[in-house]
């Protein structure tokens, strides 16, 4: 696993270079030439900033705001501003984790700004737009920001991001999905617009079974899988099933409904009526807590 600091620098470097090449939209653009600059502090490795950032959609010579939504940006008021979009889930199944995801995103760009920004620019994320983890609302949220941002700092969800790819392609809009879908590794899927980071759900599924067989205090011969269809659950399940086939482990059952159709009672019912040696869930934090609580009430102490 890559150290988080190194991984963050790689993501920043890629996005900085892409922003240098993409100004977005059809509005008139100007280019301000900037010599490559190395910015370094005692707390961070050296970062070479991008030269020739284009002004246009989401990029302005005016300074960034000092705060967004009450959160400081650490922007330099003597520099221009690069604006990024935020498509988050504030009211849907991932509302519980939305604040932490957003805090991390904003914190990263605060750090970037505090170490010199990108050439003659600071970077800020605009106010997040609620998608409720719904593809159609995700598109509406994208439309609300597409003329105001140079790239997406975060697009939460795999099906949701796939749903807006056509529009992103029209805008030449790059983004960093909060999603580790294995399809992002293929240009035929992401059209070269996705800033990929981390390991894919499929690989994580393989590793999960491998780790469980080596580390858990049971002889795992049968397993159950639950997750969200068409989301990370399917990708995760495919990895687990592939590893199970190679290891001679039987997948006794799968419960993979669409995200908004996940039934906690049905999931717990499978655990009670079709017991297995280990369970491999890939659901949201709220659903996971409900499933674990329901299983405990039924007398189960699942290994998950």
Task: Report the location of each language-model feature.
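Signal peptide-proximal N-terminal region
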Residues: 84, 103-125, 218, 245-249
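Bacterial N-terminal signal peptides that target proteins for export
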Residues: 1-11
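C-terminal motif of bacterial Sec signal peptides marking the signal peptidase cleavage site
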Residues: 18-21
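Extracellular/periplasmic bilobed ligand-binding domains
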Residues: 171, 237-304
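Extracytoplasmic "Venus flytrap"
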Residues: 64-78, 85-106, 128-135, 157, ...
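Extracytoplasmic ligand/sensor domains, especially the bilobed periplasmic-binding protein
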Residues: 69-70, 149-255, 303-304
């Amino acid at each position: 696993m890559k150290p988080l600091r190194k991984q963050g620098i790689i993501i920043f470097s890629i996005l900085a270079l892409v922003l240098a090449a993409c100004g977005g939209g059809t509005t008139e653009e100007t280019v301000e030439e900037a010599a490559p600059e190395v910015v370094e502090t005692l707390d961070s490795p050296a970062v070479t900033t991008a030269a020739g950032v284009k002004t246009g959609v989401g990029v302005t010579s005016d300074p960034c705001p000092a705060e967004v939504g009450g959160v400081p940006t650490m922007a330099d008021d003597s520099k221009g501003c690069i604006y990024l979009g935020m498509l988050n889930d504030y009211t849907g199944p991932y509302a519980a984790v939305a604040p932490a995801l957003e805090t991390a995103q904003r914190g990263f760009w605060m750090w970037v700004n505090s170490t010199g920004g990108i050439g003659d620019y600071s970077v800020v994320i605009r106010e997040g737009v609620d998608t409720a983890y719904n593809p159609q609302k995700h598109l509406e949220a994208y439309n609300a920001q597409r003329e105001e941002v140079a790239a997406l700092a975060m697009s939460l969800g795999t099906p949701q991001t796939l749903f807006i790819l056509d529009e992103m392609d029209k805008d030449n809009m790059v983004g960093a999905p909060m999603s580790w879908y294995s399809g992002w590794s293929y240009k035929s899927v992401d059209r070269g617009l996705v800033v990929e980071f981390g390991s894919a759900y499929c690989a994580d599924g393989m590793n999960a079974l491998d780790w469980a067989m080596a580390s858990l205090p049971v002889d795992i011969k049968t397993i159950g899988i639950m997750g969200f269809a068409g989301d990370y659950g399917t990708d995760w399940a495919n990895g687990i099933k592939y590893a199970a086939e190679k290891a001679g482990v039987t997948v006794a059952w799968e419960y993979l409904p669409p995200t908004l159709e996940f039934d906690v009672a049905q999931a717990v019912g499978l655990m009670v009526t079709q017991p297995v040696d280990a369970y491999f869930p890939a659901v949201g934090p709220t659903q996971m807590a409900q499933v674990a609580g329901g299983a405990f009430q039924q007398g189960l102490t699942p290994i998950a």
